[in-house]
């Protein structure tokens, strides 16, 4: 009898349904090229388990109540729900092309970007019912929200643009050209910051109308950006150049660049102050000490992309990469 990948996946996930909590905390590393999720012990920095998925996972998001970690499998067209403390599978839900996903600050909405299908879906976060689908010209990629959850800002890589969706009206507020192949998005101090891969800059955008007001050079292939837990530093991964740049959050002035070979992509922050950085082209994760510039290396699966850290004792304190 021929055993399909779907059957093997179901059996593997069944075995994961009753895992004990990880004593030292667990890191979820999403291997987009390996159709898997690596579970890494945060103390030993060793992979302790690998969870298969159907096709091609990329990003994850922690549910507002902190009880579920959602992982999107784009080609598999489903979202998997895991216990963030034990990695036990909770459920699976059909979702079209869930490349990037994120909950609004008020916990009311879940927005899912379908990069391949050129669509942005807005769900009711409580019921998981689709509220509206927005057809997009080309490649909706990353996102972030206004703090009051009134708008979500989505980078459109295929048209060098960004769009703002009014979540109260479920309507497009504006679409504007902002650079060349924009990717990561971050709300900061009343403005929207966008990592613009094609120009090697971080672009500052007015959230009211999409006007570009400033550009900050960070490095070749500026891909994604993340706010530090203390809100003092913005970290920018320059994927093509193999560097990670720190910006002063108050002035947006570059402070320092760190060499991290292998395509630094997403970042999560550990309680000990170190940064976990996925290295997209290297099958590895760098655990960077920002004080020394040195990093430890964690071997994971092929093309690691999104990640989530669940330290010992509190999943709610973890930071998931967008």
Regions found by a protein language model. Name each.
Residues 1-11:
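Bacterial N-terminal signal peptides that target proteins for export
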Residues 11-322:
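Predominantly soluble domains enriched in secretory-pathway, periplasmic, or organellar proteins
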């Amino acid at each position: 009898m021929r055993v399909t990948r779907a059957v093997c996946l179901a059996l593997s996930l069944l075995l994961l349904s009753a895992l004990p909590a990880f004593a030292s905390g667990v890191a979820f590393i999403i291997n987009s090229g390996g159709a898997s999720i690596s579970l890494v012990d945060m103390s030993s920095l060793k992979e302790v388990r690998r969870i298969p998925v159907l096709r091609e996972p990329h990003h994850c998001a922690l549910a507002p109540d902190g009880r579920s970690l959602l992982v999107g499998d784009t080609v598999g067209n489903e979202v998997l729900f895991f216990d963030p403390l034990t990695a036990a599978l909770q459920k699976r839900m059909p979702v079209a092309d869930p490349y990037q996903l994120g909950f609004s600050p008020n916990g009311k909405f879940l927005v899912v970007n379908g990069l391949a299908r050129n669509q942005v879906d807005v769900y009711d976060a409580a019921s998981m019912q689709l509220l509206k689908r927005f057809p997009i010209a080309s490649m909706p990629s990353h996102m972030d929200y206004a703090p009051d959850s009134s708008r979500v800002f989505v980078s459109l890589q295929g048209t060098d643009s960004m769009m703002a969706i009014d979540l109260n009206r479920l309507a497009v507020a504006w679409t504007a050209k902002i650079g060349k192949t924009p990717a990561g998005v971050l709300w900061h101090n009343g403005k929207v910051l966008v990592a613009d891969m094609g120009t090697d800059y971080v672009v500052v955008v007015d959230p009211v109308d999409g006007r570009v007001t400033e550009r900050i050079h960070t490095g070749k292939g500026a891909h994604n950006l993340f706010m530090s837990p203390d809100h003092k530093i913005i970290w920018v991964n320059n994927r093509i150049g193999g560097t990670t740049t720190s910006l002063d959050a108050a002035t947006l002035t570059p402070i320092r660049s760190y060499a991290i070979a292998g395509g630094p992509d997403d970042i999560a922050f550990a309680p000990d102050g170190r940064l976990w950085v996925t290295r997209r082209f290297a099958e590895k994760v760098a655990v960077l000490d920002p004080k020394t510039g040195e990093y430890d290396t964690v071997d994971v699966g092929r093309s690691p992309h999104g990640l989530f850290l669940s330290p010992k004792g509190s999943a709610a304190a973890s930071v998931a990469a967008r």
